[in-house]
Amino acid sequence: MIRAGIVGATGYTGVELLRLLLAHPGAEPAVVTSRGNAGERLDAMFPNLRGHTDLAFTEPDPGLLAECDVVFFATPHGVAHAMAGELLSRGTRVIDLSADFRIRDAALWSRWYGQPHGAPELLDQAVYGLPEINRKRIPDARLIAVPGCYPTAVSLGFIPLLEAGLVDTAHLVADAKSGVSGAGRKAQVGMLLCEASENFKAYGVAGHRHLPEILQTLGDVAGQTPGLTFVPHLLPMIRGIEASLYAVLKDMDTDLQALYEQRYAAEPFVDVMPPGSHPETRSVRGTNRCRIAVHRPQGGDTAVVLSVIDNLVKGASGQAVQNMNLMFGLPETAGLDGIAVLP
């Protein structure tokens, strides 16, 4: 049984990790840390865990965490910078759900996150944990950078078009919408019920922190950095991301449905829906699945790709567990085969 540590387990991605690991057939949470809640039982803070664990939060002690096989960081930016190096030196593998190691250029990371990069010496060994493009590198990785939620939905939607060289990469558009849990569990006026409910708005149009990550990923696939207009929106719901993606086709003869079905045929967590489909966020709620539909309206020169994920699962904690499974030689789907709850 894999012994897992979780640093920062009081946020939404942290408790989602707990939910997934407590039901996992090959792993278990062994150390769960929180500076502000040390000594408190997990199930006292999260009653949904009652009957599943007797663990209590502890202080983030590197010595205790180093006894784990793998440590997940579900923390604000900068925390993994400070702790990952020591854990790696002690032989513990690290899976970071924050953005600390996603961007390979330390100076670029600093510009977008407004602070110096705290561990640039670790960037070369960090593997970007999107299994659909990096599966061969993940098993041997010591440090995994789990992709962000928007980058996951957007990248999975665009990848087949870019790999095939079918579109004008200078003019891609990603119109993405997220539920409020994407902002985290901290108190914010804009996330209050009276502010977010019955409301819909764009934000970060001038530049969102996920933009350089998306550009890096799509650039790796396309062989050159694309031109991308990325506009995120806030939806009045708790979970879910819907990304509507647009690209101008260079080749009008390719069967886009067949392209997507063939590209993702062997992917356990990407579901290409039948022609004419419009995937719904509720169909992936609580699951590690990405559902995709591809369209070519009126037979024109524009490809429209619709991509939905649960931002807390495939967009965060589920993808982290998927990476853990690959790192430790477990079935990739272990602990991740749940079905979305409807309605």
Swiss-Prot record:
Which InterPro entries does this UniProt record tie to the protein?
AGPR_AS (IPR023013), AGPR_type-1 (IPR000706), NAD(P)-bd_dom_sf (IPR036291), NAGSA_dehydrogenase (IPR050085), Semialdehyde_DH_NAD-bd (IPR000534)
The principal location of this protein is: cytoplasm
Gene Ontology terms, cellular component aspect? cytoplasm
Its GO biological process terms?
L-arginine biosynthetic process
Pfam families for this protein: Semialdhyde_dh, Semialdhyde_dhC_1
Metabolic or biological pathway? Amino-acid biosynthesis; L-arginine biosynthesis; N(2)-acetyl-L-ornithine from L-glutamate: step 3/4
| Record-listed E.C. numbers | 1.2.1.38
Cell compartment(s), UniProt: Cytoplasm
Which keywords belong to this entry? Amino-acid biosynthesis, Arginine biosynthesis, Cytoplasm, NADP, Oxidoreductase
Query: Please, which domain of life does this record's source organism belong to?
Result: Bacteria
State the reactions this protein catalyses: N-acetyl-L-glutamate 5-semialdehyde + phosphate + NADP(+) = N-acetyl-L-glutamyl 5-phosphate + NADPH + H(+)
Give the positions the UniProt entry annotates as the active site: 149
Any idea which GO molecular function terms this record carries?
A: N-acetyl-gamma-glutamyl-phosphate reductase activity; NAD binding; NADP+ binding
Q: What class of enzyme is it?
A: oxidoreductase
Question: What does the record give as the function of this protein?
Answer: Catalyzes the NADPH-dependent reduction of N-acetyl-5-glutamyl phosphate to yield N-acetyl-L-glutamate 5-semialdehyde.
Family affiliation: Belongs to the NAGSA dehydrogenase family. Type 1 subfamily.
HAMAP family in the record, alphabetically? ArgC_type1 (MF_00150)
> What protein am I looking at?
N-acetyl-gamma-glutamyl-phosphate reductase
According to its UniProt entry, this protein's organism is Thioalkalivibrio sulfidiphilus (strain HL-EbGR7)
From the UniProt record, report the name of the gene that encodes this protein.
Answer: argC
